From Swiss-Prot:
Renumbered residue ranges of the record's region Disordered: 1409-1433
InterPro entries in alphabetical order: ConA-like_dom_sf (IPR013320), EGF-like_dom (IPR000742), Laminin_aI (IPR009254), Laminin_dom_II (IPR010307), Laminin_G (IPR001791), LE_dom (IPR002049), LMN_ATRN_NET-like_EGF (IPR056863), Neurexin-related_CASP (IPR050372)
Domain of life: Eukaryota
Chain residue ranges for the region called Domain II and I: 256-825
Protein name: Laminin subunit alpha-4
GO annotation, biological process: blood vessel development; brown fat cell differentiation; cell adhesion; negative regulation of cold-induced thermogenesis; regulation of cell adhesion; regulation of cell migration; regulation of embryonic development
Organism: Mus musculus (Mouse)
Residue positions with a glycan: 39, 104, 215, 308, 333, 458, 550, 571, 574, 631, 639, 735, 751, 754, 780, 803, 1088, 1283, 1361
Motif range (Cell attachment site): 717-719
Length: 1816
């Protein structure tokens, strides 16, 4: 029975264990991570699982009773069927959980598929789970798991696989998963792939590596490439073979013979050799370290001997230098001899080439003669053939007409045959045939020889450039060698001078040594005599003795503290390392102070002994302070240790508590076990199960507690012991340092006693001298500091070439940024009824005059249930207005529990009471309050949100000022803005004189600008750091704040290391949503050195500028078709996609806008700026040279993503000034700027002639312009400016202002009102009225929608359009309240900016003199420079917007975008500008400044000289380096930069000549200076200043030939002695410095210019001219040729038509072609002109026309000069009307099938750019 009971218990426990394990397993299986068919899986719960655990289990039947297969025993004892969805026939008794699920299923009821399988085991077909088809179900399944979504299978691929069905290998792996048996393996490129990639790049199918780096090759980049040798796998040191281009061993580098193949099987030898070499290198390093460790010091007493040996050594080296100099001189002589021998060879080669050319011409002539003879022979043969044919025809004729007998015929035939044989045998024919064959052979031979000579001649000519280049390099090397020799001579002379100086110094030292001995004797006598003179310092010495005694006491206390610390060390468990380190630092400082004192004590300077005594006193005080600080630090460390010990004790207490609970559980389990002993078998089994569970839980709890204890001990006490040990070491070190200090300071008493004996006779005059010196220094500083401040201001106003001005500017920027950040702190302040805040208004008072709006969040304290004194019904909220508070103000208050808005415009208050929602009924969270004033109309808004929904309660109340005033007339110095209360010395007006506000308050906006309480001027009775603000709930009106960011035009965000969230791949994507009304702004920016990427908004359209190191320069991607204008105050989704490292795509609102291809380059950036960037980044040289825009973004952004990964911009550490949310008020366009050709229009329901009132601000410098216009039939209502007078015209009745100076650039406010009795016009505060002639007549009110205009009108010919700004417009409407117009909502906007109005100021003379009657905008606005002002731009080169009118027929602008005051040189050898100058410009000192940008290595930049070029000054490029040179008498001073500056970036260069010294300053950082001895000769300059090049034949005398040719690049901002040089007297092949992409072609600029071809081209009686053009204007001269007798040819365009005019000496005749396709469409078009005597044909693309002129009986074929692109007017005949020069590009110019090179033209005059043509 006992055995049976035991077995039953074991069986019950086993069943319980199985149930627990099954439950745990099923629980784990429930964590299925995928959403199937878009719905979440909800687990089912069996009722038995939720049964009470305390139910008695006596109903469970004995274990021997089993249910059938497919059934399980429930707790009630019944058999129930298993619910396993047909996937199992076994389930667990009690719970019904299924066991042994089949068909790849799992779960409590086999209702789910295993990972890697998919199907519907419950309802699906088939009814079992199949392997995931990723990509193949059974044979190739590479998915972790899969699921269905939207009817499709989604695979979760393994690590090495990608694709919707895992059908591809991931990047960095290769293989073909679709091929059965194939898997994805990792790429193996031996570590020689691109290190910038996160994986090795190989073919995704074969695994062959792409782009092997480090000079490697092979399938896996496993060996060095041909021509290299080394270890490609391990050492990765493949180096170039040194075999003269021949092959070498790929491992050792040994040179091999041609065709030699490296045998296989030598790998072991190579690796053995590599190991031996490595061991040899290690032994060499050991030997080297041993040699370096050998000491080479010398004794001090042998210093003189060593000096003599050094002199001897220097003399030896001097002789070596002389020998080297002699050797160099011999080498130079040899080089010169070699050069002399080389020059005859070159001349011989040239002579041989000439002889070959002459022989070729002779052979050609003889060949032509032979051909003529052969032609003559052929003609003779033809004549003979004709005669034979004639004879034959005659024979036939006579044979037919005469009947001959057979005998006669036979005779004749025999005779004919004889004649034929005789003819054949005649000698002349044979001789001529042989001669012809021989001459033909000789001609062929001569022709081949001529070809060979021609080939040799061409080869010889091809060698000329190489030889010349070698000669040039050799010449440069000789120059460098000469300079090196000169430098060596200088060094030799310097060494000789140093030797002499050393000798003299040695003698001086010996003499000084003797004098020192004598002075020492004198000093000894003085010391003995000064003992009696020191009575005054005696008191000081006694005080020092006292200090020493105190220090001794302090050290005793330190010893006591040390013992106390050592006693407490045993209780320490943790100690702060930082505090101990600080104590050690203090001890170290003590050591330093002691050392300093010791040095002072050992000094023998008698005149400083008193001061040293004072220093010693200060040192003692410092020692005492440091010791006390060390004690405090130690005490602090002890306190921290005690706190940590208490914390550990608390943890021990918790552990003991848990242990007691465990014991209680154990006792309960034992009691249960005791009770279970008396129960039956079922109870025993149940009890055993419960006891086992309790024991298991107890054991688990104990294990957890033990683990916790161990972790605590390991983490805390172990670390504490370790730190304690460290602390002991530190304290011991501190004690040792303190002991050392004591040892050092102990001799002080002895030294002081010595002082007392030696300083008795010291004179006290040293004190008086020191005091007088200090007084004089203070007085001097007092005088100098104001002067320094003045100089600081002066330096700040000058050109920022120094770091001081930049620092000042940076400080100001930081202050502005700080204020900007403070204005965006969206946190409330708690006001207690006594506090107040004065806020910076941030908005100009001019902007507040006509329109004022303030919004804020308020949370007043709740009203108590019972009246108390704490709650106040009347409270002051805010005040904005004048300081005198009598008029011109507005405010907000609470009166009688209601919100009250008060404003005053000069006479009386207007109070608007919002009584529909008492303040006491507001909820206990923030509500929005907004007060607004438009003119005389006021309004207060209240928005009360709801916590439970997005619904809001809105309340509004309106009011109106009854007087005539409409402006809030404030001045900046008289304006204050108080919130919550006012200071005690400020008196509020009576309507606002209430108790201060109690509660929380937060400012939101002021006139649409974000504002904050934390941007305060002063705070009163408040500490913001202690006053806890109220938390603002995220209610309905703030939901949008969390997802969007606001940029105010000065803020920006920076995301560092964007690759931490995503990687650059085949497709790189940036996404962002923006919302803005601005025209311009910087959206995204990435910079890395000279490479950059910029996404900008210009005039409302997107532009992308980027350069990833492209060889062709930056790429510009723009919305040329104007598909997406984004400055409409709506959100637009922008995507930048970079595909396959070579294609940039711009997508807006998921629509493709533009794309462009570029050179294949990866994105080289890791950081990105959003919405703007710091000024130091925007003003960098890279961005200044390429980016036209540096305006930060203003508006809202959200959803910034990189590779579809979101970034929270406010969490970035360097984000500056970015605010939460997107305030709607900040996106309203209340202002519009008109340029004289623009207007805006809208259609609304407004009655302008009946009960109308409207107003607006305007600001302009133009005296005339249409401000507002409306028409209804013949009735017109308009407001305009006429000669500075405001005129209102209503149905022909005009009301005019009395003042005529409203075009002064200041803001003015206009209010118009029309009633049935009068018309009224108010300008500022001047009121004018006129009678309504329709008084008493009933007029029907217009209720239909009508169009009205601001700024101009397309239907008003009477008025010119307005130039200036209009803002804050409002109307009285029929359908809504008075409010400010949002111009963004207007339906028609033509060339109008709705974002900013440029601040314009009138010139001084305009304030006293009337302007002209002109509607065009003035050109002398602020920001433009006068003619006399310097044109140097201190910030950088600006982009020049050309003022030339654009041709309406042309797609391209006539003036491409260029840099202001910068010009492009090059293309021809003598491209240049010439400037005239005065003689006084070049005196003893002359200074030039210039900016340059080039990629050329040679070229002339600047040159000026006299007529004979004896006196000269020049700046040029040589081998990429800048060289500044001028003459000093017969010598030349040359300054050459060490670095190269032909990097394509802008550089500032200043070169100065001052008598015989020169200075070269580059970029304000590098200063090079040289000097020559003055010559005394006069320095005179007479010729012009050459810039960019010189005239032919100039500068060759002084500059090497390669640098004489023209500079190729851009030069700008030339200044002479601080004055700008702008007007060139002559220009040759110089154009503005264009920015943007360029292509091959010759560009003729709008400034005019032409090209004169060389003499090898002429237009005579017969020719063909062909060329391609891309015009930028529809008219202009293309080609012109003329002769002295009046004949000419002229090809030009006129309004898109191509015309050819010809005069052949008889009369003019012409033809023309009007192409169907516009020539000015921005594309290339081909034009061909063909002349054959009097016939002229013109081809334009595929269209042809011709003309036949009169014949000239005596034609003369003249050689006429050919002009291209223009012609001087003096050469045009009266019959040929002058035509303007051609503007555009010309290329592929051909005359008679011979291409023309404009770079070799006879003359290039004017603004013509050779071989460089802008494309946009």
């Amino acid at each position: 029975m006992g055995w049976s009971t035991a077995w039953c218990s074991v069986l019950a426990l086993w069943l319980l264990w199985c149930a627990v394990c099954s439950n745990a397993a099923s629980g784990d299986g429930n964590a299925f991570p995928f959403d199937i068919e878009g719905s979440a899986v909800v687990g089912r719960q069996d009722p038995s699982e939720t049964s009470d655990s305390g139910v008695t289990l006596g109903r469970l039947p004995p274990a021997a009773e089993r249910c059938d297969a497919g059934f399980f025993r429930t707790l009630s004892g019944e058999c129930a069927p298993c619910d396993c969805n047909g996937n199992s026939h076994e389930c667990l008794d009690g719970s019904g959980f299924c066991l042994h699920c089949q068909r790849n299923t799992t779960g409590e009821h086999c209702e789910k598929c295993l990972d890697g399988y998919i199907g519907d085991s419950i309802r699906g077909t088939p009814r079992f789970c199949q392997p995931c088809p990723c990509p193949l179900p059974h044979l190739a399944n590479f998915a972790e798991s899969c699921y269905r979504k939207n009817g499709a299978v989604r695979c979760i691929c393994k690590e090495n696989y990608v694709g919707p069905n895992c059908e591809r290998c991931a990047p960095g792996y290769y293989g073909n998963p679709l091929l059965i048996g194939s898997t994805c393996k990792k790429c193996d490129c031996s570590g020689n792939s691109d290190p910038n990639l996160i994986f090795e790049d190989c073919d995704e199918i074969t695994g062959q590596c792409r782009n092997c780096l480090r000079n490697t090759t092979g399938f896996k980049c496993e060996r060095c490439a041909p021509g290299y040798y080394g270890d490609a796998r391990t050492a990765k040191n493949c180096a170039v073979c040194n075999c003269g281009g021949g092959p070498c061993d790929s491992v050792t580098g040994e040179c091999l013979e041609e065709g030699f193949e490296v045998p296989t099987g030598c790998d072991k030898c190579v690796w053995d050799l590599t190991d031996d070499l490595r061991l040899a290198a290690l032994s060499i390093e050991e030997s080297k370290s041993g040699l370096l460790s050998v000491s080479s010091g010398a004794a001090a007493h042998r210093h003189v001997t060593d000096m003599n040996s050094t002199i001897h050594l220097l003399r030896t080296r001097l002789s070596e230098r002389e020998n080297q100099y002699t050797l160099r001189k011999i080498q130079i002589n040899n080089s010169e001899n070699t050069l002399r021998s080389l020059l005859p060879d070159v001349e011989g080669l040239h002579e041989k080439g000439s002889q070959a050319s002459r022989k070729g011409m002779l052979v050609e002539k003889e060949s032509m003669d032979t051909i003529d003879q052969a032609t003559h022979l052929v003609e003779q043969a033809h004549n003979m053939r004709d005669k034979i044919q004639e004879i034959n025809s005659k024979m036939l004729y006579y044979g037919e007409n005469q009947e001959l007998g057979p005998e006669e015929i036979a005779e004749k035939l025999v005779l004919a045959q004889k004649m034929l044989e005789e003819i054949r045998s005649r000698q002349p024919f044979l001789t001529h045939r042989e001669l012809v064959d021989e001459e033909a052979d000789e001609a062929q031979e001569l022709l081949s020889q001529a070809e060979n000579w021609q080939r040799l001649h061409n080869d010889t000519r091809s060698l000329f450039p190489v030889v010349l280049e070698q000669l040039d390099d050799y010449n440069a090397k000789l120059s460098d060698l000469q300079e090196s020799i000169n430098q060596a001579l200088d060094h030799v002379r310097d060494a000789e001078d140093m030797n002499r100086a050393i000798t003299f110094k040695q003698r001086d030292h010996e003499k000084q040594h003797e004098r020192v001995k004598e002075q020492m004797e004198v000093v000894g006598a003085s010391l003995s005599m000064s003992a009696d003179s020191l009575t005054i310092p005696q008191l000081t010495l006694e005080e020092l003795d006292e200090i020493i005694k105190n220090a001794s006491g302090i050290y005793a206390e330190i010893d006591g503290a040390k013992n106390e610390l050592q006693g407490k060390l045993s209780n320490l468990s943790n100690l702060s390392h930082d505090l101990v380190q600080e104590a050690t630092d203090h001890a170290y400082n003590l050591q330093q102070e002691a050392d300093e004192l010791s040095r002072n004590l050992h000094s023998s300077d008698m005149n400083g002994l008193v001061q040293k005594a004072l220093d010693a006193s200060n040192v003692y005080e410092n020692i005492a302070n440091y010791v006390s600080e060390a004690n405090e630090t130690a005490e602090l460390a002890l306190n921290i240790t005690d706190r940590i010990y208490d914390a550990v004790s608390g943890i021990d207490t918790q552990i003991i508590y848990h242990k007691d609970e465990s014991d209680n559980l154990l006792n309960q389990a034992r009691e249960l076990q005791a009770k279970a002993d008396s129960s039956n078998d079922e109870a025993v089994a149940d009890t055993s199960r419960r006891v086992g569970g309790a024991l298991w839980r107890k054991g688990a709890l104990r294990d957890r507690l033990n683990d916790a204890v161990k972790q605590l001990q390991a983490a805390e006490r172990g670390d504490a012991h370790q730190r304690l040990g460290q602390s002991k070491l530190f304290i011991e070190e501190a004690n040792k340092t303190t002991a050392a200090v004591q040892q050092v300071t102990t001799p002080m008493a002895n030294n002081l006693s010595n002082w007392s004996q030696n300083l008795q006779t010291f004179d006290s005059s040293a004190y008086n001298t020191a005091v007088d010196s200090a007084r004089d220094a203070v007085r001097n500083l007092t005088e100098v500091v104001p002067q320094l401040l003045d100089q600081l201001r002066t330096v700040e106003q000058k050109r920022p070439a120094s770091n001081i001005s930049a620092s000042i500017q940076r400080i100001r920027e930081l202050i502005a940024q700080t204020r900007s950040v403070a204005s965006k702190i969206q946190v409330s302040m708690m006001f207690d009824g006594q506090s107040a805040v004065e806020v910076h208004p941030k908005v100009s008072v001019d902007d507040l005059k006509a329109f004022t709006s303030i919004s804020l969040y308020m949370k007043p304290p709740p009203k108590p249930a019972e009246p108390t004194g704490a709650w106040v019904a009347d409270q002051f909220v805010l005040y904005l207005g004048s300081k005198n508070a009598k008029k011109e103000y507005m405010g907000l208050a609470i009166k009688n529990d209601n919100l009250v808005y008060v404003y005053n415009l000069g006479m009386k208050d207007v109070e608007i009471l919002l009584d529909s929602k008492p303040v006491s009924s507001w909820p206990a969270y923030f509500s929005i309050v907004k007060i607004e004033r438009v003119g005389k109309h006021g309004k207060v808004f209240l928005t009360v949100p709801s916590l439970s929904s997005t619904a809001e309660e809105k309340f509004i109340k309106k009011g109106e000022f009854a007087g005539d005033d409409s402006l809030l007339d404030l001045t900046p110095e008289d304006t204050v803005f108080y919130v919550g209360g006012v200071p005690a010395n400020f008196k509020l007006p009576a309507s606002l004189n209430l108790p201060s506000y109690s509660g929380c308050l937060e400012l939101a906006t002021l006139n649409n600008d974000v504002i904050s309480l934390y941007n305060f001027k002063h705070i009163y009775n408040m500490d913001p750091s202690k006053s806890v603000p109220c938390a603002r709930d995220k209610l309905a009106f703030t939901q949008s704040r969390a997802a969007s960011y606001f940029f105010d035009g000065s803020s920006y965000a920076v995301v560092r290391d964007i690759t931490r969230r995503g990687k650059f791949g085949q497709v790189t994507r940036f996404d962002i949503e923006i919302r803005t009304p601005a025209d311009n702004g910087l959206v995204l920016l990435m910079v890395n050195g000279s490479m950059f990427f910029s996404l900008e908004m210009r005039n409302g359209y997107l532009h992308v500028f980027y350069d990833f190191g492209f060889s062709n320069g930056p790429v510009h991607l723009e919305d040329t078709l104007k598909k997406a204008q984004i400055n409409d105050a709506k959100y637009h989704e922008i995507s930048i996609i970079y595909h396959n490292d070579k294609k940039m795509i711009l997508v807006v609102d998921r629509r493709h806008v533009k794309s462009t291809d570029n050179e294949k380059k990866k994105i080289p950036f890791t950081d990105i700026y959003i919405g703007g960037a710091p000024q130091e980044v925007l003003q960098s040289r890279t961005l200044r040279a390429h980016l036209p825009l540096d305006i930060n973004f203003r508006g809202c952004m959200k959803g910034f993503q990189f590779q579809k990964k979101d970034f929270n911009l406010l969490e970035q550490t360097e984000t500056l000034g970015v605010g939460y949310g997107c305030p709607e008020d900040s996106l309203i366009s209340r202002r519009a700027y008109f340029n004289g050709q623009s207007f805006i229009a809208s259609i609304q329901k407004i009655s302008f002639f009946d009960g109308f009132e409207g107003g607006f601000n305007f600001r302009t410098l133009q005296p005339n312009g249409l401000l507002f216009y409306y028409t209804s039939g013949s009735d017109v209502f308009s407001i305009s400016l006429d000669n500075g007078t405001v005129v209102m015209d209503v149905k022909g009745i005009k009301v005019m202002s009395t003042d005529k100076q409203y075009h002064d650039g200041l803001p003015h406010f206009v209010v118009t009102s029309i009633s049935d009795t009068r018309y009224e016009l108010v300008v500022d505060k001047s009121r004018l009225r006129g009678k309504n002639p329709t008084k008493g007549k009933a007029e029907q009110t217009q209720t239909t929608e009508k169009k009205f205009y601001f700024g101009g009108s397309p239907i008003s010919p009477q008025y010119a359009n307005f130039t200036g700004c209009i803002s804050n417009a409002y109307f009285t409407r029929l359908d809504r309240d008075v409010e400010v117009e949002d111009f963004q909502r207007y339906s028609e906007k033509v060339h109008t900016s709705l974002y900013e109005c440029p601040i314009e100021s009138s010139p001084l003379f305009l304030l006293h003199k009337k302007g002209k009657n002109s509607s065009k905008p003035k050109t002398n606005k602020q920001g433009e420079k006068s003619k006399d002002a310097p044109s140097w731009d201190p910030i950088g080169l600006k982009f020049l917007e050309q003022k030339a009118p654009r041709d309406s027929h042309c797609h391209l602008s006539s003036s491409p975008r260029a840099i202001e005051h910068a010009y492009q040189y090059g293309g021809t050898a003598n491209s240049r500008q010439e400037f005239e100058h005065e003689q006084g410009d070049f005196g003893e000192k002359s200074q030039f400044a210039i900016r340059l940008k080039t990629r050329s290595s040679h070229g002339m930049i600047f040159y000026v000289s006299d007529q004979e070029e004896n006196d000269f000054m020049t700046l040029f490029l040589a081998h990429g380096r800048l060289v500044f040179m001028f003459n000093v008498g017969h010598k030349k001073l040359k300054i050459r930069s060490q670095e190269k500056y032909n990097d394509g970036l802008w550089h500032d260069v200043i070169f100065i000549r001052e008598k015989s010294s020169g200075r070269l300053v580059i970029d304000g950082l590098r200063v090079l200076e040289e000097r020559l001895p003055p010559s005394g000769a006069a320095w005179k300059i007479k010729g012009p200043i050459y810039l960019g090049g010189v005239a032919p034949g100039r500068a060759v005398k002084n500059v090497q030939i390669t640098s004489v040719y023209s500079f190729s690049g851009c030069l700008g901002n030339l200044q002479l002695n601080g004055a700008s040089i702008t007007s060139a007297s002559q220009t040759f092949s110089v154009t503005p410095c264009f920015e943007g992409p360029m292509e091959t072609g010759t560009y003729f600029s709008t400034e005019g210019g032409y090209v004169v071809l060389d003499e090898s081209f002429n237009i005579g009686l017969k020719f063909e001219i062909a060329f391609e053009v891309r015009p930028r204007s529809s008219s202009g001269t293309l080609v012109h040729g003329h002769s002295v007798n009046g004949e000419y040819l002229n090809v030009h365009m006129r309004n898109g038509q191509v015309i050819v005019k010809v005069n052949n000496g008889v009369r003019d005749f012409s033809t023309s072609v009007t192409p169907k396709q516009n020539l000015c469409d921005g594309r290339w078009h081909r034009i061909t002109v063909i002349r054959d005597s009097n016939v002229v044909q013109l081809d334009v693309d595929s269209e042809v026309n011709h003309v036949v002129g009169p014949l000239n009986p005596k034609p003369v074929d003249h050689r006429e000069p050919v002009f291209v692109g223009g012609v001087p007017e003096s050469l045009l005949t009266p019959r040929l009307a002058p035509s303007k020069p051609f503007t555009g590009c010309i290329r592929h110019f051909v005359i008679d099938s011979r291409p023309v090179s404009f770079s070799k033209a006879a003359l290039v005059s004017g603004a013509v750019s050779i071989n460089s043509c802008p494309t946009a």
